[in-house]
Amino acid sequence: MERRADAATGKRPIRSFVRREGRLTAGQQRALELLWPAFGLERPPAGQPLDLDRAFGRRAPRILEIGFGNGESLAEQAATHPERDYLGIEVHRPGVGHLLMEVEKRHLGNVRVMMADAAEVLAHHIPDGSLHGVQLFFPDPWPKKRHHKRRLVQPQWVRAVAAKLAPGGFLHLATDWADYAEHMLDVLEAEPDLENTCGPRQFSPRGERPETKFERRGLRKGHQVFDLYYRKREHPG
């Protein structure tokens, strides 16, 4: 995966992630080799949109999940909602391999996967108004103050998400870092095209988001999980 410079400034964008490759299991390696051609999507050339109708072979409500980890949550949702299409973006190959294994095991035809910088894909390759929902669950909190600029949830990113959502489309975030949760609220409440479904500055119930092993482990340690659920206004300003 290449790192493309910003067309206007020529500068490399600030990354919200670090590629911690980790070791691939034999099953993950096999899945990447055999299943990627069917379920993996390459990033299009600069300025060209993803043709998701062609990629999925149909037109259906589309959910984008950014940073899906090992894909446990995404696979569960795709199995529960076969009427929806799920595009997952993740930079870590072991997680992509694990999701592809789940896709095969569960016979999920409504999942496609990309290994790319999700912020760049969102900005340059997703048509405006084309998404039914965007999900970001447990992103890197970058807890040190000097690293806060690396947090994915920033005003520019939220503005881009709002543009890609269809009217009535949702943005669902979750984190177990209280400081990041408050930061998310600050940024989201300032976006005029999004409305908090639970009221101003309110956190949301977990709703349809599956509880993952990672989350259950944190809850046993006493971590609190914060969900935020917003919808794009039907008549955005």
From Swiss-Prot:
Residue numbers annotated as active site: D140
Region span, Disordered: 197-217
Xref: PANTHER family: 3-DEOXY-D-MANNO-OCTULOSONIC-ACID TRANSFERASE/TRNA GUANINE-N 7 - -METHYLTRANSFERASE, PENTACOTRIPEPTIDE-REPEAT REGION OF PRORP DOMAIN-CONTAINING PROTEIN
Annotated gene: trmB
Pfam family for this entry, one: Methyltransf_4
This enzyme's EC code(s): 2.1.1.33
Protein name in UniProt: tRNA (guanine-N(7)-)-methyltransferase
Binding site for S-adenosyl-L-methionine: E65, E90, D117, D140
InterPro entries reported for this sequence: SAM-dependent_MTases_sf, tRNA_(Gua-N-7)_MeTrfase_Trmb, tRNA_methyltr_TrmB_bact
SUPFAM superfamilies reported in the protein's UniProt record: S-adenosyl-L-methionine-dependent methyltransferases
Keywords: Methyltransferase, S-adenosyl-L-methionine, Transferase, tRNA processing
Disulfide feature: none
Binding positions for substrate per the UniProt entry: K144, D176, T212, K213, F214, E215
Biased composition, class Basic and acidic residues, residue ranges: 206-217
Top-level EC class as recorded in UniProt: transferase
Protein family membership: Belongs to the class I-like SAM-binding methyltransferase superfamily. TrmB family.
Purpose of the protein: Catalyzes the formation of N(7)-methylguanine at position 46 (m7G46) in tRNA.
GO molecular function, one term: tRNA (guanine(46)-N7)-methyltransferase activity
Gene Ontology, cellular component aspect: tRNA methyltransferase complex
UniProt pathway annotation: tRNA modification; N(7)-methylguanine-tRNA biosynthesis
Reaction equation(s) it catalyzes: guanosine(46) in tRNA + S-adenosyl-L-methionine = N(7)-methylguanosine(46) in tRNA + S-adenosyl-L-homocysteine
